[in-house]
Every structure is written in C-alpha cells, then in structure tokens.
Regions:
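Primarily marks hydrophobic transmembrane alpha-helices of the MFS/SLC 12-helix fold
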Residues: 74, 286-293
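Hydrophobic core of transmembrane alpha-helices in multi-pass small-molecule transporters
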Residues: 16, 84, 97-118
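Symmetry-related core transmembrane helices of the 12-TM Major Facilitator Superfamily/SLC fold
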Residues: 176-194
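Helix-to-loop junctions at the C-terminal end of transmembrane segments
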Residues: 57-70, 169, 269-287
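C-terminal ends and interior cores of transmembrane alpha-helices
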Residues: 79-97, 296
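Central cavity-lining transmembrane alpha-helices of secondary-active solute carriers
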Residues: 45-63, 260-273
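Helix-loop boundary and gating motifs at the non-cytosolic
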Residues: 2-53, 218-262
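Cytoplasmic helix-loop-helix junction between adjacent transmembrane helices
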Residues: 107-154
C-alpha cells in the first residue's frame, strides 16, 4: 500500500474515533446534567470553556503540528481528551452547584483543547498526504475531494457519536460511559503512535504563528462568516433542541437519534460536494458563493 494512503487511513481512523467520543460527550454532558437539575442556561455555560479553548487551540494547532510533527500533536490531543473524560467522571453534584459547574467547565475546556489539537493536526495531515500523491486530477481538485470526504465522514461520525452517547448513557450510566470512551481513546492512541512515521508532518524551517494567518481577504471573510454560521446553528442545535425534546418526554436515545440523523445527513452532503461541484467550476466557486448562501 502507498505510504501516503496508509498515513491517510491512520489519521482518518484516529479522527473518527476521537470525533465519536466528542459527539458522545456532548450529548452525555447535556442530557445527564439536565436530568441532574442544571438549567438550560447553566448547561449552555458548560460549553463556553469548550468553545473558547477550542478557538485558542485552533490558532496555534497548525504551528505546533509544523514545528513538532503531526504525530505528536495527535498524541497530545488524545492524551488531553482522555484526561478530560477521566476528570469529568469524578464530578459529583453533591459538591454544590458552583464547585461542580467550575469543575465541569475545566473538564470541558480540556476536551475543547483536545478537539482542536486533533482536528488541526488531522487536517494538516490530509493536505500533506494529498500533496504527495499523483494522478490525473489537479492538486487542488484532489485536495478538495479528500478534504470534503474527510470532513463529511467526520460529521457523520459525530452523528454516530450523538447516538452512541444516548445509548451509552441509557445502558451504562454517566461515569461508566466516560470510562468506556477513555478505553477507546487509549486503543486508538496506541494504534496511531505505532502506525505513523515519527516526524510525520514536521518541517525543517520553523514558521511563526503569524504566518499561519491568511493574507487573502476572501479567506478571512469566509472565516468570519463561518463563525456566525456556526453560532446560528449552535444557538438552537447544541442546547435548545435536545433540552426541549427531552423535557417533552423524549428518551435519551430518541433525542440523540434525531441529532444523529441530522448530523449524518449534512456530513453526507459535505462528502458528496465534489460530485455536486465539477472540477471545471472550482476556480470560479467564489463568484457563486452568494447564490449558494441565498439558497440556504
């Protein structure tokens, strides 16, 4: 097997497993603590440290991957995720609302750091392995296809994680579910560390963090738009919808199943995007962005 293909498969499997635990954790935290009496507003606050830690980590993740190697950053992400899950498993609402909330915020922050370490390193690996392959299609087209499939499959796996989280919480309860996910993280950590080259993705010349910010105004505008797009989605999808459904009498599995279906569906759309947008239209895709946005 081509070494680039092998590395791509390893990174993808790593990210799939991590994303499964990330999706499962979201639904487990939300439903468990709502059942324990936390208000919807407090639950929303629990995700603040997760998101803010992720934003900060995302800024430096690419720089760290380049300077220290993708393999190391993937490993660090998995270790931090297992630490966050382990710490969260000991939380007890008998500690009092303030102490329990602060502890959960700390654990969620760890998981947010882990998510963006793993995400940034994985996407860097996809670009690296894509650049090494040769074929009939252009480099840009190949990268577009690989990233689309990778991102789509990631979101599909997150949807499976939502459903898995509901099932785990129903069958095993809060603490045991978290420990099962730690065990899964340990397994994929061992696999990743034994399969990827030691210096995978490490560059000889060190680059400054500033160099990773795009000088292209269009890219920066898209990044800004993406923040508001995700914010508009998360307002209703992350907390409001599942809390409303659960308070309306839905079970853990029913709530997580609906969220899973929705996430898997849009992951599928992402994965087939290269089929929807022909290679000949890639260079002019920016001009069609306004029409796509109006359609959405």
């Amino acid at each position: 097997m081509n070494s680039s293909i092998k590395d791509y498969i390893t990174v993808t499997l790593n990210y799939w497993v991590f994303t499964f635990t990330d999706g499962a954790l979201r639904i487990i935290v939300l439903l468990h603590f709502y059942k324990e009496g936390f208000s919807p507003f407090t639950i929303a606050l629990l995700f603040l440290s997760y998101e803010f830690a992720g934003v900060f980590t995302n800024l430096i993740g690419g720089w760290l991957s380049t300077n220290y190697g993708i393999k190391r950053i993937l490993g660090i992400g998995l270790v931090i995720q297992s630490l966050g899950l382990s710490c969260l498993s000991v939380v007890n609402t008998d500690w009092g609302a303030v102490i329990a909330t602060v502890w959960i915020l700390f654990c969620q922050g760890l998981c947010g750091v882990a998510k963006d370490f793993t995400k940034t390193a994985s996407k860097s690996a996809i670009k690296l392995t894509s650049d090494k392959l040769e074929g009939f299609e252009s480099k840009d087209s190949r990268l577009f296809r690989w990233v689309a499939w990778f991102t789509g499959s990631k979101n599909a796996m997150k949807g499976i994680g939502f459903l898995g989280g509901g099932l785990l919480l129903t069958v095993f309860g809060f603490q045991n579910s978290l420990w099962l996910m730690v065990f899964l993280i340990v397994l994929i950590f061992i696999y990743t560390m034994t399969q990827l080259p030691e210096l995978f993705g490490k560059k000889k010349a060190s680059r400054t963090i500033k160099s990773f910010f795009s000088k292209n105004k269009v890219v920066n505008n898209l990044a800004l738009i993406r923040i508001f797009l995700f914010g508009a989605r998360d307002v209703w999808f992350v907390v409001a919808l599942p809390v409303f459904l659960y308070s309306s009498g839905w079970t853990f599995v029913q709530v997580s199943g609906l969220m899973a279906f929705w996430t898997i569906f849009y992951g599928f759309i992402q994965a087939v995007a290269p089929k929807i947008i022909p290679e000949t239209e890639l260079r002019g895709i920016g001009k069609r962005l306004r029409n796509w946005m109006l359609g959405l």
